[in-house]
Amino acid sequence: SAYEAKHNKPLKPVFRHDGKIYPPKGTVCPHCGATHEYLSYNNGNKRTQIRCKVCEKTFSTQKSYSQQVVRKCPYCGHKLSMIKSRNHFDIYKCMNPKCSHYKSELKKLSKEDKAKYKRNPSAFSLHYITRVFNASLDMLERIQLKIAPSKVDLSRIHNSKHVLGLVLTYYVNYGLSLRKTALILYEVHDIKISHQTIANYAQAASHLLFPWLDNFKHDLNAYHCGDETYVKVLGKKAYVFFMCDVKKKIITSFKIYMKRDTFSAIDAFYSVLRKFKKIPKNLEFVVDGNPIYKAAQQYFQLKRIFFKVTQVIGLTNDDPVSKQHRPAKQIIERLNRTFKYSYAVKNGFNSLEGANDFMCLFTTYFNFLRNHTSLGYKPPVELDCLKKTHNMPNKWNILLDEALNYFIESTMEF
């Protein structure tokens, strides 16, 4: 070594004094590669700086960065400024007046728009804007609606399976309230049952059906429509985000959220995407003009998941896009109307969990039991096991048996 050539003797390791702390084993000098025997702390009890006896250089034990991460505009390289912070993302904007993107967008404006822009610049979005999300796909999978088995065991209820089928038929298919269902069972069928028992049966059926419904393998098309409508939960507005296969009329998203924000739209899109074995390249969603859908699309683009979002704005066909996709928008509006008919007698829900329980029952009815005129008076999903009977209470019990078999198979350990 250089030390041995200069002093005609080998370099000795650092002398270890009793009671003193030295760098741990495995520590290596980043400059010359000397092992821990030749290293010692250079700033006393702080122990944040190490000196190497071989090369006589120092280095830090802590990782430090000269500056924070800087986000730059892809057009001009100018530093982006954070203009808004939301729960699940931050919005950054390029403020450079010489940015090529800004100049290009400015040239596209007409004389009237340029005059408006001078008077009110905030009415136009000409600068480069991007969102940085803090929600991962793993987090989306973890927060997917998971319903635990109900405390009510449907195999041990005091009433027969036929009564259970009648309860679900009147409560879900015909949109009756709990008390009206109890009344019609007593006055028409001479079955004495309380409205609370009906609520317990409905909750237990929903909890049993949900895993089977959520993981059912549909053969979906690439053309979907979506919309949100509000319901009341504890007197406050909550929002149902519906997604539906345009051609087959299959509901693919039906979760209720307390907020109508970008994250709710992201989660609604994700609940549809996870139902595809392979996401089609021509996947398209037709939605309204709410900006949360475009923001949700940007989130998936950053995750390298691509689909098209077409926004149909207003009630009239004022542009070619609205004229082309108006039928899809009308399909989701009719779905909202059908749901509102069932929801109207409920007068809201007492909890978000109870609201999602009803959504599970409604979606099961809509996808598997409700006949559609546009489908030749057939349900969106035809099951061979349901073709054997036209009796609706029997059909509900067949679906419950299918859900029970799925639950047993999914929880079985081999």
Q: Where do the model's predicted regions map?
A:
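N-terminal alpha-helical interaction blocks
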Residues: 1-45, 49-51
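Basic, short loop/linker segments at the boundary and entry of helix-turn-helix/winged-helix-like folds
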Residues: 48, 59-74, 80-172, 191, ...
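Residues in the recognition helix of alpha-helical DNA-binding motifs
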Residues: 184, 201, 362
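Short Cys/His-rich local motifs and their 1-3 flanking residues in nucleic-acid-associated proteins
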Residues: 31-35, 54-57, 75-78, 96-101, ...
